[in-house]
């Protein structure tokens, strides 16, 4: 975790000094890889820091305050962009870009240090090789075990892949809808910022609801909410309607991610959380290519992005069905030794 985060911060800062688009792209990809690698380990920490009955609440609070906190570097970077040559022109492009990436890296460091000082790993497998090859063998062995012996986790991962694919596709293409309706660059960023704030509020709401309702019930609400957002996208004609859609996305954006993480933590063996969450993040980060394929196919056929977003309702419907199936499957006995 520490190595991935440290490298990510370094490469994040270096993107601000890239002198060509190719170098910037390479540095950005490396930064993203390091960020994703650190998140895989970060997600697996949930079982170490709380009890099963509080996982939903803790996970939801984590996403909530993460969304709110991210608004701070977001705003600073936005101000730097506005002051840059593309808008006001008070500061040069290099300084404008440099402020954005430096503040992002500094924020990343600031929120990582308390975790490093306060976290103690409790659940782990002893006596295992720490090599990269051994780690990949472990992950593939875990995948084989899930496919053959753990249908609950298998059905959930497939469900998660489908509905989180829909979530990622909507988030990635929401701005495209706004652009088609006449939203400029600053307006796009402000909509994203407002969505973060809405996600903060409703993640806290779902954190409170998790004390009284089951994880699957709350996940069902989130999935149905996104399904309704997809259908509502079919009617979009102006920026007011787009704002309502963005509000709907924000309502469930943090909660569907936090509750998925906490539910997964509950159904996996704690001592193998690392490799299980490796698979979880593969399903998560690998998602959105199906949705992107739908977007591309619809646009190629002459349709609008509104229709494409509407078709994503099928992803949420299928994900919801498989989630309910997973919830009805009995918990498997974990026997992973020797993988």
Annotate the PLM regions.
Residues 80-106, 297-316:
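A membrane-interface helix-boundary motif in multi-pass transporters
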Residues 1-13, 217-232:
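Structural signature of the two symmetry-related core transmembrane helices
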Residues 121-157:
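Juxtamembrane intracellular "pre-TM" segments in multi-pass secondary transporters
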Residues 107-118, 310-339:
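Multi-pass alpha-helical transporter architecture, strongest
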Residues 201-215, 299:
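Helix-to-loop junctions at the C-terminal end of transmembrane segments
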Residues 59-81, 281-291:
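Glycine-rich segments within core transmembrane alpha-helices of 12-TM secondary carriers
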Residues 14-28, 234-245:
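Helix-loop junctions at membrane interfaces in 12-TM secondary transporters
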Residues 172-188:
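Short amphipathic helix-loop junctions that connect adjacent transmembrane helices
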